[in-house]
C-alpha cells in the first residue's frame, strides 16, 4: 500500500452539505471521503461531468472508489450557516415551478470558515502508482463546492505501513472503531459511501467519528483500538 499526505491551504474554507438536505442545508465540519476522492479525480477528469459505467452513468470519481481517504484540520476554524439565495423550484408542486415567485429561496447553508487555514488529507491505496497518485494530489484545486478554492502547499508520498492495535489519531474514522480513553472530543456524523457517485442512486449512509472540538473547530488526538490502520509519515490513519 502507498499513501499520499496532501497539505492544503484553504482560501476561505469549505462547504459540504449533509446528505438529504433540502430547505435547510447544514454542512459537515470536515469533508467526507467521497468529497476528498472527488477532489482527487479532478486532475484526471477535469471538464468531464459524467461517464458511462456500463448500464448507468455516474461521476468520474467512481473510478477511484478503491482509494481510502480521511482528513483533519491543521488550523482552527469556525462553523456557521450563511444565508444563501438558492434555486428551490424543484421542491415545488408542478403547477408552481413556472412561477418566478417560487424559483429562488433564502436557504441557510453550512460553511466552515478558515481563511488561509490548512487542511491535511491522506489517501491510501494500492490501485494506482506512486507517480500517478502524486500527480493527482498536486492537481487538487478545490474541496467541496466549486467556490471552495484550495492551494496545494506540499505532497508527501510513501509506503503505508499497516498496523493494528492501539494507536492515536487526529483523522476521522468509522464509528465501528473502538475509542479508548477520553471521549469528550467526538462528533458522530453520517457520510455516504461510493454508490452516491452513480446518478439516480442514493449512497448508503455510513457513520463516522470526528475527533474534533466544535468551537473553535479543531482536530484533536484520540486513542483507538484499530483492526486496520496505517502509519503515514509519523501519524496514523484508521479505517477499521
From Swiss-Prot:
Additional facts recorded: Cloning was done with strain P2, while interaction experiments were done with genes cloned from strain P2 but over-expressed in P1. The aCascade complex was purified from strain P1.
Subunit text: Part of the aCascade ribonucleoprotein complex, minimally composed of Csa2 and Cas5a, which binds crRNA. Other possible components of aCascade in strain P1 are Cas6b (SSO1437) and Csa5 (SSO1443), while SSO1399, Cas5b (SSO1400) and SSO1401 have sometimes been seen weakly associated. Csa2 is probably the major RNA-binding subunit. The Csa2-Cas5a-crRNA complex also binds target DNA homologous to crRNA, probably forming an R-loop. Purified aCascade forms a filament about 6 nm in width.
Keywords from the UniProt entry: Antiviral defense, RNA-binding
Protein name (database record): CRISPR system aCascade subunit Cas5 1
InterPro entries, per database record: CRISPR-assoc_prot_Cas5_N (IPR013422), CRISPR-assoc_prot_Cas5a-typ (IPR010153), CRISPR_Cas5_sf (IPR053725)
Originating organism: Saccharolobus solfataricus (strain ATCC 35092 / DSM 1617 / JCM 11322 / P2) (Sulfolobus solfataricus)
Transmembrane segments: none
One of the GO BP terms on file: defense response to virus
Its biological purpose: CRISPR (clustered regularly interspaced short palindromic repeat) is an adaptive immune system that provides protection against mobile genetic elements (viruses, transposable elements and conjugative plasmids). CRISPR clusters contain spacers, sequences complementary to antecedent mobile elements, and target invading nucleic acids. CRISPR clusters are transcribed and processed into CRISPR RNA (crRNA).
Secretion signal, residue range per the UniProt entry: none
MF (Gene Ontology): RNA binding
Similarity comment text for this entry: Belongs to the CRISPR-associated protein Cas5 family. Subtype I-A/Apern subfamily.
